[in-house]
């Protein structure tokens, strides 16, 4: 770092310290703030808790400070909520007050400062984007239109694994093939397109760019520059990479998918009012009507690439891992499928309603291994009240949904993978947020609308894999490693596991 930058930074630190002390004193008199560790000027609690604000570390802090606590991260207030009652306040009762989204330097780049739907602030733009995205993506009509495609993609996975000579002996990293399946599931909906194989050059570019985007956005390593603006110059190189990745991704979306669809113009299906057009046709209609611009179109595609593909893939991978490590549960699920559907009848989307144990396996996977354990952060635009405390305007609000679903005060032996709980003591709990102890998709205005797609895709995929294979750990291992890797608000398996898949004979 050159001396001029160092000098400016030191001067900035001194001035910020003076301002921070003054502001902290004034605000302390004005507000009754939630409890939390004592902050220091400039850095707040950052030096105490560090960058790694994952769900388990925040759970440890909740055990110390209570169901609501405040972390002062540099110049930002971070409020963490860890009880069903307070989660209900944030997500439902005061859903408008806490319905906005926080900004950070990296997500500002990847979303064009909130031109998307998922990360934009609460208001008219969000309502418009939600409406435009709901019809082509998140309705029962979409499920019925595309469920045959999901079933055929799952069937293709089964056939490819059967053809792999290593899969039944030394094992295969099945995630790679499932990733292609998930891209095809969503690109069918978005563009009426699919990729024939993992070797498809466009698929490889998409996968690489989306992976890099996920790594950059989910990393904790940029937090210091986001929390403490005067340290932001040190992020210059990191943010430059983010901008390059964003621009390359959006150009790929535009050149190979959006513009290609525009060239096709009206097709036979789009002229038939009784048939649902693919999603991009609906979105381009909104652009032609002047409701959104081209950037909004591309950021909708960006949201689906991130929020729909990867999160569902993480959950499928977790489900497979738990079934491998619990062979008795895997066999119980297989027995249910054989008994209800009969030998050779492959699981379809309508069949899921006849398979309660399969539904319970999906729900238990989402409980124990929640893909978005802290949900997407919320924010209050104005000063608010929560749990008897004052919450200053523009505070970042995290709901520790993983702890809500894994707190032994609310769940019987929550550390166990036990689908039976959803037949026994938790028989009334559903994934749609009907119980604030269990919020895998959130609830309320900013809940994840992708629940309507994720649940059937999870059911079809896990059902067909268990139906067609005995899933085992690789030779020499009694179990597969289920160590976690947490991100800004993600939870996925640390190591993509090798799975032995022995075909069954019917």
Curated annotation (Swiss-Prot):
This protein's record includes keyword rRNA-binding: no
Query: What InterPro entries does this protein's entry cite?
Result: Cyt_P450, Cyt_P450_CS, Cyt_P450_E_grp-I, Cyt_P450_sf
Q: What pathway is this protein said to act in by its record? A: Phenylpropanoid metabolism; trans-4-coumarate biosynthesis; trans-4-coumarate from trans-cinnamate: step 1/1
**Entry keywords, A to Z:** Heme, Iron, Membrane, Metal-binding, Monooxygenase, Oxidoreductase, Transmembrane, Transmembrane helix
Domain of life from the UniProt record: Eukaryota
Q: Name one GO molecular function term.
A: iron ion binding
| TM stretches of this protein | 3-23
The positions annotated for binding (E)-cinnamate are 213-218, 307
Keyword Membrane listed: yes
Induction record: By fungal elicitor.
Q: Where in the cell is it found?
A: Membrane
Xref: SUPFAM superfamilies: Cytochrome P450 (SSF48264)
* Major subcellular location class: membrane
Q: Enumerate the catalysed reactions.
A: (E)-cinnamate + reduced [NADPH--hemoprotein reductase] + O2 = (E)-4-coumarate + oxidized [NADPH--hemoprotein reductase] + H2O + H(+)
UniProt-recorded name of the protein: Trans-cinnamate 4-monooxygenase
Q: Which cofactor does it need?
A: heme
GO cellular-component term (any): membrane
What range does the record give for the signal peptide?
A: none
For this chain, the family text in UniProt reads: Belongs to the cytochrome P450 family.
Q: Which parts of the sequence bind heme?
A: 448
Q: List its EC numbers.
A: 1.14.14.91
Coiled-coil segments on the chain, per record: none
Q: What does this protein do?
A: Catalyzes the first oxidative step of the phenylpropanoid pathway in higher plants by transforming trans-cinnamate into p-coumarate. The compounds formed by this pathway are essential components for lignification, pollination, and defense against ultraviolet light, predators and pathogens.
Q: How does it sit in the membrane?
A: Single-pass membrane protein
């Amino acid at each position: 770092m050159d001396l001029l930058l160092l000098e400016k930074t030191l001067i900035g630190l001194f001035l910020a310290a003076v301002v921070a002390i003054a502001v902290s004193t004034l605000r302390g008199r004005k507000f009754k703030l939630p409890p939390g560790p004592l902050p220091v000027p400039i850095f707040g609690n950052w030096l105490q808790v560090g960058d790694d604000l994952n769900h388990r570390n925040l759970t440890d802090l909740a055990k110390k400070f209570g169901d609501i606590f405040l972390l002062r991260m540099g110049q930002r207030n971070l409020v963490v909520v860890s009880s069903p009652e307070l989660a209900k306040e944030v997500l439902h009762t005061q859903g408008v007050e806490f319905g906005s989204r926080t900004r950070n330097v990296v997500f500002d780049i990847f979303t064009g400062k909130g031109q998307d739907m998922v990360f934009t602030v609460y208001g008219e733009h969000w309502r418009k984007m939600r409406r435009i995205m709901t019809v082509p993506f998140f309705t029962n009509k979409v499920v019925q239109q595309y469920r045959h495609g999901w079933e055929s993609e799952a069937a293709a996975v089964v056939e490819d694994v059967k053809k792999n000579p290593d899969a039944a002996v030394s094992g295969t990293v099945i995630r790679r093939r499932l990733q292609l399946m998930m891209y095809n599931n969503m690109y069918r909906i978005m563009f009426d397109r699919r990729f024939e194989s993992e070797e498809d050059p466009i698929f490889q570019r998409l996968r690489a760019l989306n992976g890099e985007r996920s790594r950059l956005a989910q990393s904790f390593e940029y937090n210091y520059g986001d929390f403490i603006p005067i340290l932001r110059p040190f992020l210059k190189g990191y943010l430059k990479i983010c901008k390059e990745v964003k621009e390359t991704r959006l150009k790929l979306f535009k050149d190979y998918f959006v513009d290609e669809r525009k060239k096709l113009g009206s097709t036979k299906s789009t002229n038939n009012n009784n048939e649902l057009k693919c999603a991009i046709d609906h979105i381009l209609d909104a652009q032609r009507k002047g409701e959104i611009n081209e950037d909004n179109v591309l950021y909708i595609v960006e949201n689906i690439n991130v929020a729909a593909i990867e999160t569902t893939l993480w959950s499928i991978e977790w489900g497979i891992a738990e079934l491998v490590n619990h062979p008795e549960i895997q066999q119980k699920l297989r027995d249910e499928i054989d008994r209800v559907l009969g030998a050779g009848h492959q699981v379809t989307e309508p069949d899921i309603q006849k398979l309660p144990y399969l539904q319970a396996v999906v729900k238990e996977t989402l409980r124990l291994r929640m893909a978005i354990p802290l949900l997407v952060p919320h924010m209050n635009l104005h000063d608010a009240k929560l749990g008897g405390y004052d919450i200053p305007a523009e505070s970042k609000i995290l709901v520790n949904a993983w702890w809500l679903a894994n707190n032994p005060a609310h769940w019987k032996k929550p550390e166990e993978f036990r689908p039976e709980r959803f037949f026994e003591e938790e028989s009334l709990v559903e994934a749609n947020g009907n119980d604030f102890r269990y919020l895998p998709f959130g609830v309320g205005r900013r809940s994840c609308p992708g629940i309507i797609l994720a649940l059937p895709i999870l059911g079809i995929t896990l059902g067909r894999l268990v139906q067609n294979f005995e899933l085992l750990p690789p030779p020499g291992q009694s179990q597969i490693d289920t160590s976690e890797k947490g991100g800004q608000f993600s939870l996925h398996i640390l190591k993509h596991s090798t799975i032995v898949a022995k075909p069954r004979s019917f």
